A protein has these predicted regions:
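Alpha-helical cap/lid subdomain in secreted, periplasmic
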Residues: 50-192, 198, 202-220
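Short, conserved active-site loop motifs that form the nucleotide-linked donor/cofactor pocket
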Residues: 4, 27, 160
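Short, solvent-exposed loop/turn segments at secondary-structure boundaries
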Residues: 9, 42-43, 137-142
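Short, small-residue-biased leader/transition segments that mark boundaries at the very start
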Residues: 1-8
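N-terminal post-signal-peptidase region of extra-cytosolic proteins
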Residues: 38-50
């Protein structure tokens, strides 16, 4: 089922346009993403459960988190996880609810999603998060030391396909240069314009080919 939904203030995510990369006579596309969610809050709000229960053997699931996974753990937006990809956990008293909650590492949540997909006989494809429009010395900022690294580690630990979307799109933006790169974002350094969403979707298609993932057979 194809979904093309414009985000608030003309911000677009690649999930709204990824269907344009596929032959829709061969495959259907379901965009289950929700703005502002971390891996933890996507699980806590029951959004992952809906994905899990809808999965059928042979489905492909693109999984990407990272932009909303830093910050406060138990105050404010309270959506961050523990940093890293290990098995650590810690109990926090949540300011908003007054209840205690066990919080795990970013990698733990990704591994749970991946293993849930595998349990259903579906195929997980894990993506590093899209690059931010932040530059230093003519180079765009990468996430290789934090969320990108932890995403790769979660994929490697579970045998999932991994696409370094951060690198693929960042390489494209660097070739365009800092001035032209601004056209791919919308009023901040994180949220993409429609043009940026299409670029990231094409980068995913490139990544599927690079990873030799069977989903590539359904590309246009």
């Amino acid at each position: 089922r194809r979904q093309r939904q414009m985000c608030i203030r003309d911000r677009w995510g690649w999930g709204s346009v990824i269907a344009d990369e596929f032959d829709l006579n061969k495959i259907s596309v379901e965009n289950c993403a929700m703005a502002g969610r971390s891996a933890r809050t996507f699980l806590d709000e029951g959004r992952w459960d809906k994905v899990y229960h809808a999965l059928q053997p042979g489905d492909f699931v693109l999984i990407q988190f990272g932009h909303n996974d830093a910050g406060e753990i138990n105050t404010g937006k309270a959506r961050a996880e523990l940093p890293g990809s290990g098995e650590e956990s810690k109990v926090f008293l949540m300011e908003k609810t007054g209840k205690y909650q066990v919080i795990y590492t970013f990698g733990w949540y990704l591994r749970k999603f991946i293993m849930d997909v595998q349990e259903k006989g579906a195929i997980p494809i894990v993506l590093s998060h899209t690059p931010r429009n932040k530059w230093k010395d003519g180079k765009i900022e990468r996430n290789t030391a934090s969320f990108g690294k932890w995403t790769r580690e979660a994929a490697e630990a579970t045998g999932a396909y991994f696409i370094d979307l951060n690198k693929i799109s960042a390489d494209k933006l660097e070739k365009k240069g800092i001035k032209k790169a601004a056209d791919y974002y919308n009023n901040d350094h994180t949220h993409t314009s429609l043009k940026g969403a299409h670029m990231n979707a094409k980068s995913i298609a490139d990544g599927l080919k690079m990873a030799d993932c069977p989903l590539k057979q359904n590309l246009k």
